[in-house]
Amino acid sequence: MLRLLAIETSCDETAVAVVEADAAWPTFAPRQLSSVVASQIDLHAAYGGVVPEVAARRHVETLPFVLESALQQAGLGMAEVDAVAVTCAPGLVGSLLVGLMAAKTLALLYNKPLIGVHHLEGHLFSGFLAAADLRPPCLGLLVSGGHTSLIWMKDYGEYQTMGRTRDDAAGEAFDKVARLLGLGYPGGPQIDRWAQQGDPDRFPLPEGKLDHPYDTSFSGLKTAVLRLVQQLQQEGQELPVADIAASFQACLTRVLTEKAVACAEALGLSTLLVTGGVAANRELRARLLEAGRQKGLRVVIPPPNLCTDNAAMIGAAGLCHWLRGETSPLELGVASRLTLEEIPALYGQGSGGCGQAPTGAAAAVF
């Protein structure tokens, strides 16, 4: 049994988790022993969005307590943990550095391997926590505040981006439209809540047609909502917030569903994995599950607490790399941008003297 401590501080959640998996391959079924998340939503709400410097400072203040809580919940000490995983890219540089410095310190103090993890790969691995029988190949629809991508997971650690946003990410579009409607931050849950009471067919909105079949563009949709709001205000009408929210949400979720299903079919894949904060949206989940039922496509959507940023998903990805004999050097840095295809750059000679491959059953794989 391998146990791993994971740290996630890429944006405005301070998260630590302990996960474990059997030292067997390729049967990979990670389990979380603990997962603690300290959110900064209330802190940033006054600014209408995440302030990087404020986020980094709060991580510094909060991380020691979150770390202690995660270990207590797991009933383990650092001596009983086999490795330390940490998000190192992409994200806010200041926030990433807080988590990375903590992870390096623990790795050095307790002589543990260090495993850097790509944040988006972590989101994909939330699916393996939610469905123990999930195996690649599969298509990942990753929808969050900063990313909207269709990712072909060919194998563990082997990815090809099939589609991406040309402008606003889905979560970013939710936040901006919520701001236009005066609904506050974060916008996703607000739009979701108001849309339940609205008519999704009242306002036809543009879907943003592109020449690339799997890319998305939501800037036109956002602008259409802006013009609609301005027109209604100029006419002296009270804003039908619920109907606008429902119309916007229906348009965006329809686009995501159609592109994801079309891509999965084109690749001949039988499983669609949906992750990221926007995957917590009720209408998106319902549309995707219904589309999967109609097309004979298995749709795996983790529970909402695994869709939003958390450290358990980072730990799951870290365990996979650890089982594959991949660790990071202690010189590992952070990056605000890094594609999934660049993930191999995170693993080199290993974390000094403590970056050794697993023994026993896991070692036999390599």
UniProtKB/Swiss-Prot annotation:
Residue sites binding Fe cation per the record: H119, H123, D309
CDD domains hit by this protein: ASKHA_NBD_TsaD_bac
Keywords: Acyltransferase, Cytoplasm, Iron, Metal-binding, Transferase, tRNA processing
Assigned EC number: 2.3.1.234
InterPro entries: ATPase_NBD, Gcp-like_dom, KAE1/TsaD, Peptidase_M22_CS, TsaD
Binding-site positions, substrate: L142, V143, S144, G145, G146, D175, G188, D192, N281
Function: Required for the formation of a threonylcarbamoyl group on adenosine at position 37 (t(6)A37) in tRNAs that read codons beginning with adenine. Is involved in the transfer of the threonylcarbamoyl moiety of threonylcarbamoyl-AMP (TC-AMP) to the N6 group of A37, together with TsaE and TsaB. TsaD likely plays a direct catalytic role in this reaction.
Family classification: Belongs to the KAE1 / TsaD family.
Name of the featured protein: tRNA N6-adenosine threonylcarbamoyltransferase
Source species: Synechococcus sp. (strain JA-3-3Ab) (Cyanobacteria bacterium Yellowstone A-Prime)
